[in-house]
């Protein structure tokens, strides 16, 4: 019983804190959608900041990937247009 008795003592303050925090957050979101939207925008801003600092290499890699993606759809579209035009001419 000693093993079973120890974890509840450790877990109870965490569970109590989680129970206290979650109803407040849920009530705030239900009461004010503007505040919830403000939290989302703040989260987006914080997420963007590290992305701006880090990816010099990612910025270089992105332009290389985009032209390849741009060329492929153009190659796919061109034969389709030619097939459509041919019956019209006939």
From Swiss-Prot:
InterPro entries associated with the record: H1/H5
GO function term, MF aspect, one: DNA binding
Disordered: annotated segments: 1-90
Subcellular location: Nucleus; Chromosome
Domain of life where this protein originates: Eukaryota
Signal peptide: none
CC terms in the record's Gene Ontology section: nucleosome; nucleus
ATP-binding keyword on record: no
UniProt biased composition (Basic residues): 11-90
A GO biological-process term: nucleosome assembly
Keyword match Calcium: no
Keywords: Chromosome, DNA-binding, Nucleus
Protein name: Histone H1.M6.2
Organism: Trypanosoma cruzi
């Amino acid at each position: 019983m000693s093993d079973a008795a120890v974890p509840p003592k450790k877990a109870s303050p965490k569970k109590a804190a989680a129970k206290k925090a979650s109803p407040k957050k849920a009530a705030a979101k239900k009461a004010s959608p503007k505040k919830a939207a403000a939290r989302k925008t703040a989260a987006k801003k914080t997420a963007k900041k590290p992305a701006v600092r880090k990816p010099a290499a990612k910025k270089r890699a992105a332009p290389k990937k985009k032209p390849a993606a741009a060329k492929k759809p153009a190659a796919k579209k061109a034969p389709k247009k030619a097939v459509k035009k041919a019956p019209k001419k006939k």
